[in-house]
Amino acid sequence: MSPNPTSDLSAIEQLQKEKILNPAARGQVTQDLSENIILTTVDDLHNWARLSSLWPLLYGTACCFIEFAALIGSRFDFDRFGLVPRSSPRQADLIITAGTITMKMAPALVRLYEEMPDPKYVIAMGACTITGGMFSSDSTTAVRGVDKLIPVDVYIPGCPPRPEAIFDAIIKLRKKVSNETIQERSTVMEQTHRYYSTPHNMKAVSPILTGKYLATPTRQAPPKELTEAIGMEVPPALASQKQKEEA
């Protein structure tokens, strides 16, 4: 007579349950127990908590912020990423610069960044924030890149970038946070940006605007051709010099 496999399996399961309830011998890790245990490290647990609750400080100065404001609505719903907008830099660990950074707003941006607790991250959103955009050629007040002021972790090119691009930047930032360690955060690391850290060979030239424009020879005495063309009278101090030139 062949044994019943179903009855043997139920007997084994009953025996395992009795050992768990009253272990007379050295216990073994059963399948039920292994499925309810999570093995991790302090770094992974800490990074998981931080990347799941990034609190951004919204710094919108131009039209790129309109695209970011679309994320707050129900269509995109950026709350599902754990992003909670904060109005105080002391409660935020992420600042998103959306729009043109001007010389007047640069000190305020740097101060907000310095007031944020460590570790902190920066996302540069839009062409105007990254390189100055359409204001980079002739504007006298636009900063040519926010990374001249604060270190940037993720760049989002576009004019303006779509909300989907912002989600992609958030995902890339979450991957960066997940790879960090507590030992790296405990040491003070100097963050450099592309301009000050790149060696270059530049020739120093004398300034063009020295404030002595009125002291130039052409301003002290108008050229002869100019006086003759517009019919100016020759100053008495230059009359003798004119006579010498004509002789």
Swiss-Prot record:
It is a peripheral membrane protein. Its EC number is 7.1.1.-. PROSITE patterns: COMPLEX1_20K (PS01150). It is an enzyme of class 7 (translocase). Its cofactor is [4Fe-4S] cluster. Gene3D superfamilies: 3.40.50.12280. Belongs to the complex I 20 kDa subunit family. NDH-1 shuttles electrons from an unknown electron donor, via FMN and iron-sulfur (Fe-S) centers, to quinones in the respiratory and/or the photosynthetic chain. The immediate electron acceptor for the enzyme in this species is believed to be plastoquinone. Couples the redox reaction to proton translocation, and thus conserves the redox energy in a proton gradient. Cyanobacterial NDH-1 also plays a role in inorganic carbon-concentration. It comes from Crocosphaera subtropica (strain ATCC 51142 / BH68). [4Fe-4S] cluster binds at residues 63-64, 128, 159. Keywords: 4Fe-4S, Iron, Iron-sulfur, Membrane, Metal-binding, NAD, NADP, Plastoquinone, Quinone, Thylakoid, Translocase, Transport. Residues 218-247 are annotated as: Disordered. It is found in: Cellular thylakoid membrane. Binds 1 [4Fe-4S] cluster. One of its GO terms (biological process) is electron transport coupled proton transport. This is NAD(P)H-quinone oxidoreductase subunit K.
